[in-house]
């Protein structure tokens, strides 16, 4: 479970301080498709970067599976990014002279995984996004939608718990955007997918939860997650199941 508690993020010093996030608190479910919706400069990408450990909060706390990150060292953040998070960027970030297969394998190169295992997992990831027959192409031989699917495969190869997507369809046409969104929707069935977007139609069509942000503050949440209250509800339902209802057919003789 991922939780942000009163997150504040400031840039600059003295009179030049800019507050990008101001008291953001939110809890995410283990598997859901969350769209963070807002205009440019509202703080949504900063929020995504803090969730992914690419940037650090000024105050507040990011809680990962019940553990505070306030005392995290660099190695802890590295482990979190490498094993728990998959990143998908609008610009794809593919290496142009490498094949599709090599680009996806690269995510495992520093993880100590054997070459044969890297190859196997990269092929499986590419098959999941419908590119199992495009392994040896270079990025410049592919369409924008295909390159974004390569980026998704690369993000999946470590089997992360959380997938973070920053405007994943921003550079794509409508038809290709639909293909990418359908893949993300499928992934969200057993992972937490958090997507930053400024496109309300896209968010409403595909996300299971829409979080709105404006001027560094959350202004709306279509399906808030409050684990304590949900636990209470589950417990109440469980208790109700064991409530004994007297049988009116039973009589007591005098």
Name the predicted role of every residue range.
Residues 2-207:
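ABC family nucleotide-binding domain
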Residues 59, 214-215:
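Residue-level recognition of short loop/turn positions
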Residues 73, 214, 222:
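Residues at the C-termini of beta-strands that transition into short coil/loop
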Residues 209-212:
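Conserved short hydrophobic beta-strand within the ABC ATPase nucleotide-binding domain
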Residues 217-245:
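Conserved beta-strand-loop-alpha-helix hinge in the C-terminal portion
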Residues 247-254:
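Long, low-complexity, intrinsically disordered segments
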């Amino acid at each position: 479970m991922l939780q942000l508690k009163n997150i504040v993020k400031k840039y600059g010093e003295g009179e030049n301080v800019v507050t990008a996030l101001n008291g953001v608190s939110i809890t995410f479910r283990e598997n859901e498709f969350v769209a963070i919706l807002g205009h440019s400069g509202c703080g949504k990408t900063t929020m995504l970067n803090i969730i992914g450990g690419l940037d650090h909060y000024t105050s507040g706390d990011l809680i990962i599976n019940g553990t505070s990150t306030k005392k995290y060292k660099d190695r802890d953040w590295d482990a979190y990014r490498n094993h728990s998070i998959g990143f998908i960027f609008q610009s794809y970030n593919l290496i142009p002279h490498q094949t599709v297969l090599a680009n996806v394998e690269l995510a495992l190169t520093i993880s100590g995984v054997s070459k044969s295992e890297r190859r196997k997992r990269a092929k499986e990831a590419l098959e999941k996004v419908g590119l199992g027959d495009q392994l040896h192409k270079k990025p410049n031989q592919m369409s924008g939608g295909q390159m974004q699917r390569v980026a998704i495969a690369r993000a999946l190869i470590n089997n992360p718990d959380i997938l973070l997507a920053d405007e994943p369809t921003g550079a794509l046409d409508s038809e290709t955007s639909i293909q990418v969104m359908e893949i993300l929707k499928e992934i969200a069935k057993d992972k937490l997918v958090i997507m930053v977007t400024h496109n309300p139609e896209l968010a409403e069509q595909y996300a299971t939860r829409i979080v709105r942000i404006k001027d560094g503050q959350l202004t709306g949440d279509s399906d808030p997650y409050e684990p304590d209250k949900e636990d209470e509800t589950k417990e109440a339902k469980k208790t109700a199941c064991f409530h004994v209802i007297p049988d009116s057919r039973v009589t007591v003789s005098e």
